[in-house]
Amino acid sequence: MLNEFPIFDYEDIQLIPNKCVIKSRAEADTSVTLGNHTFKLPVVPANMQTILDENVAEQLAKGGYFYIMHRFDEAGRIPFIKRMHDQGLIASISVGVKDYEYDFVSQLKADAPEYITIDIAHGHADSVISMIQHIKKELPDTFVIAGNVGTPEAVRELENAGADATKVGIGPGKVCITKVKTGFGTGGWQLAALRWCAKAARKPIIADGGIRTHGDIAKSIRFGASMIMIGSLFAGHIESPGKTIEVDGEQFKEYYGSASQYQKGAYKNVEGKRILLPAKGHLQDTLTEMEQDLQSAISYAGGRQVADLKHVDYVIVKNSIWNGDASH
């Protein structure tokens, strides 16, 4: 039972250092393999309209990073796969579970994407299990990511249905208000939920939501994630698709959730909100900084590669990471 586990979130955990075995953090290898491909970082920008469009997806793929294209331009998905494959890049798309998506998946046989993410808010569902089975039947070589879920039972069921990876996180994101609207979710205990789910998993887990600092990437790996999906830290860049808005002479970019009225265009079943983020620099600068910070984390872990973070000790100190830092 869950109640036997300590409940904590990212800000409650500090990892404990080990003796460093590398001369420079630059020696630390941040690459990870998911399916048949290896990527520079165990990080993937959230498949949301204000985080990436086709151009950002292409930039990420060319740079050796994993990406998942969102599913909100349905008609553009097949041309997008062709655009990526024509350049020798991997194609990674999202699908929902509505009836017409079954025909869409069957149409992909001629030019199958390397990755498909089944992307719905409550992924522990018969509809998701049925879609996993359909994709695996039609496109046996495509790597299927299914989510989102928040329990070990869900992870096991989706894996048993054929999912190659599961995405864990129900509403912990900065622009997600599922926990407020419904009373359900992993907000406030996302890291403990990740740990709980990872203990049951036999295949990779993607932690999704609640990442606020680069140190949270290392913590996610410690508690069982193979890949970490990040929204707000990737929003608001020069390349980001969100609208740029000027307020009192300062530039902001809009960032909204995938079930918000801004994305749906209608105020129904809303579980997302819109916020404005101060406009940042280039996306590549953030990716480089994440890589350097993760290299430092690996060196503190006494390791040489990402997997070495899985073995460090940790301490639970409630809400401790901003202690002594009055600016927060």
Curated annotation (Swiss-Prot):
<dbReference type="GO" id="GO:0003920">
    <property type="term" value="F:GMP reductase activity"/>
</dbReference>
<dbReference type="InterPro" id="IPR005994">
    <property type="entry name" value="GuaC_type_2"/>
</dbReference>
<comment type="similarity">
    <text>Belongs to the IMPDH/GMPR family. GuaC type 2 subfamily.</text>
</comment>
<dbReference type="GO" id="GO:0005829">
    <property type="term" value="C:cytosol"/>
</dbReference>
<dbReference type="InterPro" id="IPR050139">
    <property type="entry name" value="GMP_reductase"/>
</dbReference>
<keyword id="KW-0521">NADP</keyword>
<feature type="binding site">
    <location>
        <begin position="205"/>
        <end position="228"/>
    </location>
    <ligand>
        <name>NADP(+)</name>
    </ligand>
</feature>
<dbReference type="GO" id="GO:1902560">
    <property type="term" value="C:GMP reductase complex"/>
</dbReference>
<dbReference type="GO" id="GO:0006163">
    <property type="term" value="P:purine nucleotide metabolic process"/>
</dbReference>
<protein>
    <recommendedName>
        <fullName>GMP reductase</fullName>
        <ecNumber>1.7.1.7</ecNumber>
    </recommendedName>
</protein>
<keyword id="KW-0560">Oxidoreductase</keyword>
<feature type="active site" description="Thioimidate intermediate">
    <location>
        <position position="176"/>
    </location>
</feature>
<dbReference type="InterPro" id="IPR001093">
    <property type="entry name" value="IMP_DH_GMPRt"/>
</dbReference>
<dbReference type="Pfam" id="PF00478">
    <property type="entry name" value="IMPDH"/>
</dbReference>
<dbReference type="InterPro" id="IPR015875">
    <property type="entry name" value="IMP_DH/GMP_Rdtase_CS"/>
</dbReference>
<comment type="function">
    <text>Catalyzes the irreversible NADPH-dependent deamination of GMP to IMP. It functions in the conversion of nucleobase, nucleoside and nucleotide derivatives of G to A nucleotides, and in maintaining the intracellular balance of A and G nucleotides.</text>
</comment>
<dbReference type="InterPro" id="IPR013785">
    <property type="entry name" value="Aldolase_TIM"/>
</dbReference>
